[in-house]
UniProtKB/Swiss-Prot annotation:
<keyword id="KW-0602">Photosynthesis</keyword>
<dbReference type="GO" id="GO:0005506">
    <property type="term" value="F:iron ion binding"/>
</dbReference>
<feature type="binding site" description="covalent">
    <location>
        <position position="56"/>
    </location>
    <ligand>
        <name>heme</name>
    </ligand>
</feature>
<keyword id="KW-0812">Transmembrane</keyword>
<dbReference type="InterPro" id="IPR002325">
    <property type="entry name" value="Cyt_f"/>
</dbReference>
<keyword id="KW-0793">Thylakoid</keyword>
<feature type="signal peptide">
    <location>
        <begin position="1"/>
        <end position="35"/>
    </location>
</feature>
<keyword id="KW-0349">Heme</keyword>
<dbReference type="InterPro" id="IPR011054">
    <property type="entry name" value="Rudment_hybrid_motif"/>
</dbReference>
<feature type="binding site" description="covalent">
    <location>
        <position position="59"/>
    </location>
    <ligand>
        <name>heme</name>
    </ligand>
</feature>
<dbReference type="GO" id="GO:0009535">
    <property type="term" value="C:chloroplast thylakoid membrane"/>
</dbReference>
<dbReference type="Pfam" id="PF01333">
    <property type="entry name" value="Apocytochr_F_C"/>
</dbReference>
<keyword id="KW-0732">Signal</keyword>
<dbReference type="GO" id="GO:0020037">
    <property type="term" value="F:heme binding"/>
</dbReference>
<keyword id="KW-0472">Membrane</keyword>
<keyword id="KW-1133">Transmembrane helix</keyword>
<feature type="binding site" description="axial binding residue">
    <location>
        <position position="60"/>
    </location>
    <ligand>
        <name>heme</name>
    </ligand>
</feature>
Length: 320
């Protein structure tokens, strides 16, 4: 009986250890696997700077296009689509964190006007749900429901991302008005070149930190290189570490300059930002416009009928 209890305790202890290890792994890995929105959320209170620049560009250095499509106007308390397109060459492969090549992921940030927010699931139509797929959107901050982020997600499946947006109702929110509002978007494809702490990722160019002669190049067992540079002036040695991923451009015995690229640029992705405008339309104004158009059409009809009646009278008088 004691043997069984001891065995049960050991089994329970092993299970707990495995669970704790898995949890620690997930916590440690989360910032890297969810690099696009998480890094920005951790470092910036607002993703759009006063200059208009979206902060994702601080880590994704290459400039790439992005496109957004929204309706010209929407009525209050209605759900509409904001479609973000992130184009790139589907054939290219990016350098992964382990130095191997893999497919590109994409991510996006959508900055809506105050009052606009992600539509609740029960308000989203089946057609829009089909376009959304398995995407999961989140608020940039719990207090900033008008700023949405998504990603990283597979680029081959989500080059086009559909955000379901709920427009505000000025009748229930006094700080909302029937006006034209700007919408800002940022979209990236591929990994970034700079981490939040300013250090380089392996998806970047590595330059020489000293001028001199390349004395020795050691290829590491897990990938990457250790390059020893001898300064020609005072003979002191400088060691540059290259992570796995970038291709080496220099060889032993070669003379190099300060800041000369030691590797190729492996980055095939990039970040882009754009904007659009949307009008929160007053239903009474729409009704007034329809009434005005209807009155014009009726006036035209009466004018035509009156003209025909006048022509008949003239024809009748001519016969007499």
């Amino acid at each position: 009986m004691q043997t069984r209890n001891a065995f049960s305790c050991i089994k329970e202890g092993i299970t707990r250890s495995i669970s704790i290890s898995v949890m620690i792994y997930i916590i440690i890995r989360a910032p890297f696997s969810n690099a696009y929105p998480i890094f920005a959320q951790q470092g910036y209170e607002n993703p759009r700077e006063a200059t208009g620049r979206i902060v994702c560009a601080n880590c994704h250095l290459a400039n790439k296009p992005v496109d957004i499509e929204v309706p010209q106007a929407v009525l209050p308390d209605t759900v509409f689509e904001a479609v973000v397109r992130i184009p790139y060459d589907m054939q290219v492969k990016q350098v992964l964190a382990n130095g191997k090549k893999g497919t590109l992921n994409v991510g996006a940030v959508l900055i809506l006007p105050e009052g606009f927010e992600l539509a609740p699931p029960d308000r989203i139509s089946p057609e829009i749900k089909e376009k959304i797929g398995n995407l999961s959107f989140q608020n940039y901050r719990p207090t900033k429901k008008n700023i949405l982020v998504v990603g990283p997600v597979p680029g081959q499946k989500y080059k086009e991302i559909t955000f379901p947006i709920l427009s505000p109702d000025p009748a229930s929110k006094r700080d909302i008005h029937f006006l034209k509002y700007p919408i800002y978007v940022g979209g990236n494809r591929g990994r970034g070149q700079i981490y939040l702490d300013g250090s380089k990722s392996n998806n970047n160019v590595y330059n020489a930190t000293a001028a001199g002669i390349v004395k020795k190049i050691i290829r590491k067992e897990k990938g990457g290189y250790e390059i020893t540079i001898v300064d020609t002036l005072d003979e002191h040695e400088v060691i540059d570490i290259i992570p796995p991923g970038p291709e080496l451009l220099v060889s032993e015995g070669e003379s190099i300059k300060l800041d000369q690229p030691l590797t190729s640029n492996p980055n095939v992705g990039g970040f882009g930002q754009g904007d659009a405008e949307i009008v929160l339309q007053d239903p009474l104004r729409v009704q007034g416009l329809l009434f005005f158009l209807a009155s014009i059409i009726l006036a035209q009809i009466f004018l035509v009928l009156k003209k025909k009646q006048f022509e008949k009278v003239q024809l009748f008088e001519m016969n007499f």
